[in-house]
A protein has these predicted regions:
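Outer-membrane beta-barrel channels and translocator barrels
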Residues: 179-182, 234-238, 283-285, 333-337, ...
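Surface-exposed extracellular loop regions of Gram-negative outer-membrane beta-barrel proteins
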Residues: 192-198, 244-253, 288-302, 337-349, 355-358, 391-396, 403-427, ...
Length: 427
């Protein structure tokens, strides 16, 4: 896959107002190359949505942000939520990350985007096109990386509420505490929405109009809690640990006599996530970091009506997804004009699904490297490669070559990158 892009960058005069504009136009990004650099200096085609843009637009959820600000993304509502598409490809070929770590947990094959809390977002970086050389499986249509803020004030408490039609209500609470070397961030969010129909009528097989209970958008209630701690042991060594809990219950209409549609049960989703890591800064341009993240995502049916062996109020287990990922990554500035990245990654996916008689886990072991160099103050080049070994699908080599040439205030970019998708455990 190849692409060429050009862009113009404004240069502001000195002054407070101009500085604000410059920051908005040229933020620091990390998704395109795996290293922090200014947006105008990265050879990768990255789009950025800043926290200020999200705030000005009154955006409270991930779908709103993507729909309003990223033309290459679209969402199609269905019975189980929203179906994401990017560059014409389904969400199975889009990798969604939070601070560089994969978001897991799906509803009928669609990533459950409602578990993404927008209250802490610093910026959202969208990388168009294949990026498997850095991120591995699924990064074919593109990568969406949600970067969150870290606590800065000694004590900060914020709350926000939102109410719109269809009884859609959102309440968020955030508490930051930063004291010397230790910082804490706590967030809680509650969401609720009624279900709704375009019409209460449908056409049956005889072309007659009949009443229906089927909804275009299903009602739900959701709780999302997260906690993060950071500790700066020295100027060079830092640690972090985080965890979260996610709960969501649909609110679907029960079956009624004389009407089509309706359901015997609601669907309950519950997830736990945890992570920890450390970073050691060798110097201003070199560092080594170790990260681990785990996730346990479960779905169940909660019956409203008697069906088979189940009575109202009974739960039926349907699926559990577990995810473990450990990554060791080094970033090195061997010369003043180059940056080199090396990394190894171990990932374990586990699926328990009784209806398909699946109770299995598969691992993926990966190694990758990338070298970026700037020449003659106008040309930047990147060469990278990644090798993934999937327990069932075997090995896969993924290359990447990118270049950027500066012509005054214009950048011309060219990229060749490959992408692949390893089969899921259920596949």
């Amino acid at each position: 896959m190849g692409s060429i892009a050009a862009g113009a960058w404004a240069q502001a005069d000195k002054g407070e107002t101009s500085v604000d504009k410059t920051v908005d136009l040229n933020p620091v990004v990390v998704t395109g190359t795996g290293t922090h650099q200014r947006l105008k200096n990265t050879p990768a085609p990255v789009s950025v949505i800043t926290a200020n843009e999200i705030k000005r637009a009154g955006i409270t959820d991930f779908q709103q942000a993507m729909t309003m600000m990223v033309p290459s993304l679209s969402f199609s509502p269905n019975a189980m939520g929203s179906y994401l598409m990017m560059n014409g490809l389904s969400n199975k070929y889009v990798l969604i990350l939070i601070n560089g770590r994969k978001v897991t947990g799906d509803i009928s094959g669609n990533i459950d985007i409602s578990q993404i809390d927008m209250s802490r977002v610093k910026r959202i970086e969208v990388l168009n096109g294949a990026a498997s050389s850095l991120y591995g499986s699924d990064a074919i249509a593109g990568v969406i990386n949600i970067i969150t803020n870290q606590p800065k004030d000694e004590i900060s408490f914020t709350t926000n509420s939102r109410y719109t039609r269809k009884n859609q209500f959102s309440q968020g609470l955030n508490l930051d505490i930063a004291k010397r070397k230790l910082a804490s961030y706590t967030a809680y969010k509650y969401d609720h929405s009624d279900g709704w129909q375009n019409s209460g009528l449908t056409v049956d097989k005889n072309d007659d109009l009949i009443e229906t209970l089927d909804q275009l958008s299903i009602g739900y209630s959701m709780n999302n809690f997260s906690q993060q701690f950071t500790y700066d042991a020295t100027e060079k060594l830092s640690f972090y640990a985080n965890g979260g809990y996610y709960w969501r219950m649909t609110d679907r209409p029960a079956k009624r006599d004389g009407m089509t549609g309706g359901n015997d049960y609601n669907t309950h989703y519950e997830g736990y996530n945890w992570g920890t890591g450390a970073k050691y800064r060798l110097n201003k341009r070199s560092s080594i970091q170790l990260d681990y993240v785990g996730n346990n995502y479960t779905s169940r049916y909660k019956y409203m009506l008697a069906a088979g062996d189940y009575q109202p109020g009974d739960y039926a287990f349907t699926k559990r997804q577990k995810f473990h990922d450990a990554e060791l990554k080094g970033i090195f500035g061997f010369t003043t004009n180059s940056t080199t990245v090396f990394g190894v990654d171990y990932r374990k996916d586990i699926l328990v699904r009784p209806d398909a008689d699946v109770d299995k886990g598969v691992y993926t072991l990966s190694g990758y490297g990338q070298h970026e160099v700037k020449l003659w103050n106008h040309f930047t080049g990147i060469v990278g490669a990644r090798y993934d070994y999937h327990e069932q699908a075997g090995g896969r080599f993924t290359p990447k070559v990118a270049a950027m040439y500066n012509i005054g205030n214009f950048n011309v970019r060219a990229t060749y990158a490959a992408g692949f998708r390893a089969p899921g455990v259920d596949e």
